[in-house]
């Protein structure tokens, strides 16, 4: 039962967390709350979707085949899909260009223009309901001071990042919530190096002097390193601040943020439904995706 009307309820029900699961099958192999039980193995899993799981070889492939009991099986155009877990972006791109894969959702930035010219009918570039952002650990100096946090944000030339590093036609973000549908958020913080230097000086760090060593946490992907190095250069050029980059594999990266053992960290969020709330409620005090130590009572009252 809803506490109040929610216009985006139909959008939420499309999320995978709302998909029905077979209770009887789960209980045959353990308790409902147990993780990694045998009910998800190909020989045990019960599903009601377009495809059924036939093979799952860890770090090798996931194989699905058309579900003969699917209600609309006549309109399913392919017999199956083989998913390949490829960790190296360039390896995946090479496999696609060599004809070893039919579909890839990623392209190395330096290969985007090549792909557009060589395979114009195969490349699709569509807007995504997502935002890249940087987390600041507000429990650790110097980011306890909002002037420092804003200064670091104002020192980022977003358009330069898009043009010279990302190269995928992204749009500069004016805030955490991206534009979509008829929703057009106001720009809260943009590129303003002079304003950034002024704020940093007001906080007691003119030209970056007196700042403790700042570590920028990111993942171990090749593109993550390039993004981090671009930010590192901007903060040096626009604030006079030296940043140390620390790359970690995904699990360690997430754990380190949960433990708030970082200064700055690369982040991003893909909206789960078409409403600003999907980008805002993660910043509640006890939100599992907050990971910054930040909270604001007035903000939470407005959300509720």
Mark where each language-model region is.
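Short helices/loops that flank or line small-molecule/ion binding pockets
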Residues: 90-100, 117-118, 146-147, 229-238, ...
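Ligand-binding "clamshell"
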Residues: 113-125, 260-262, 275-290
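Short, solvent-exposed loop/turn segments at the edges of secondary structure
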Residues: 46, 57-59, 76-78, 118, ...
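Extracellular/periplasmic solute-recognition and catalytic clefts
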Residues: 54-65, 82-140, 150, 159, ...
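Append "and occasionally in soluble cytosolic enzymes with long acidic Gly/Pro-rich linkers
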Residues: 52, 65-66, 124, 144-233, ...
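Extracytoplasmic/peripheral linker and loop segments enriched in polar/acidic and small residues
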Residues: 184, 223, 237, 241-258, ...
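Beta->alpha turn/N-cap motifs
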Residues: 4-5, 89, 105-111, 158, ...
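Gly/Pro-rich hinge or "lid" segments in bacterial periplasmic/extracellular proteins
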Residues: 3-6, 13-76, 80, 90, ...
